[in-house]
């Protein structure tokens, strides 16, 4: 077992999607150049639909929430208050595992956190993400640039689930979306973030420290 990798943890309150994306790109460049440690960002977004590389505008059914094309994999999803977003800026160079293993670790993180609250999460052959029964509770989308990952996962804590009705989530018509709150689990954002950081440390063999 290698020594744990030091990772800086950054918490943001509610961040505009475009601002968060631009910050990721800047930090990825710094990581690539050896000027910054790998970084874990935990935040919530203002309401936005994000379209991955396989998405089309036809996947967005509502016009009252902004839609942004992104460079991540996947199709379309919703981000907004009550949903924990975790961006993982992780240098893959020198690693034995590639992008698929990285995505699998993100999924394991989510399932570990859900299990702590007595919720059984599972993978689905339809694509990356985690489901509870037939309802999706977490989405995952990743891009690698200059050997460093960006984007990551979103876990529905207590968002307005009606906003998911304005899209065809991840291209899957008719499949429901759920949240911890809808499953009867009441958890604060702060507590959920702490659980997610701990799960990240275990799944990625990392040692996290909080940015001031």
Curated annotation (Swiss-Prot):
Entry binding sites for substrate: 72-79, 139-141, 152-154
EC class of the enzyme, as a word: transferase
Q: Does the keyword Metal-binding apply?
A: no
Q: Domain BPL/LPL catalytic: where?
A: 34-208
**Which GO terms are recorded in the biological process aspect for this UniProt protein?**
protein modification process
GO MF terms on file? Answer: lipoyl(octanoyl) transferase activity
Q: Where in the cell is it found?
A: Cytoplasm
InterPro entries assigned to the protein according to its UniProt record, in alphabetical order: aa-tRNA-synth_II/BPL/LPL (IPR045864), BPL_LPL_catalytic (IPR004143), Octanoyltransferase (IPR000544), Octanoyltransferase_CS (IPR020605)
Q: Which Pfam families match?
A: LplA-B_cat
What pathway is this protein a component of?
A: Protein modification; protein lipoylation via endogenous pathway; protein N(6)-(lipoyl)lysine from octanoyl-[acyl-carrier-protein]: step 1/2
UniProt similarity note: Belongs to the LipB family.
Summarizing the function annotation, the protein's role is:
Catalyzes the transfer of endogenously produced octanoic acid from octanoyl-acyl-carrier-protein onto the lipoyl domains of lipoate-dependent enzymes. Lipoyl-ACP can also act as a substrate although octanoyl-ACP is likely to be the physiological substrate.
Provide the protein name: Octanoyltransferase
Q: Which organism is it from?
A: Magnetococcus marinus (strain ATCC BAA-1437 / JCM 17883 / MC-1)
């Amino acid at each position: 077992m290698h020594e744990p990798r030091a990772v800086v943890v950054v918490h943001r309150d509610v961040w505009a999607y475009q601002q968060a994306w631009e910050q990721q790109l800047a930090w990825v460049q710094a990581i690539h150049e050896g000027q910054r440690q790998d970084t874990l960002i935990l935040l919530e977004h203002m309401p936005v639909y994000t379209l991955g590389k396989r998405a089309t505008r036809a996947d967005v059914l509502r016009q009252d929430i902004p839609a942004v094309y992104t460079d991540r994999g996947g199709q379309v999803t919703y981000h907004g208050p009550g949903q924990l977003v975790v961006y993982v800026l992780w240098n893959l160079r020198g690693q034995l595992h590639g992008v698929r293993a990285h995505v699998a670790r993100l999924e394991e993180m989510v399932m570990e956190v859900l299990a702590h609250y007595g919720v059984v999460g599972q993978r689905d052959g339809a694509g990356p993400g985690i489901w509870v029964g037939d309802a999706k509770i977490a989405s995952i989308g990743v891009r690698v640039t200059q050997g460093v990952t960006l984007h990551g996962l979103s876990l529905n804590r207590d968002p307005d689930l009606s906003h998911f009705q304005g899209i065809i989530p991840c291209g899957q018509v008719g499949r429901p979306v759920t949240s911890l709150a809808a499953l009867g689990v009441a958890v604060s954002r702060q507590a959920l973030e702490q659980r997610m950081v701990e799960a990240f440390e275990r799944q990625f063999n990392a040692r996290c420290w909080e940015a001031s």
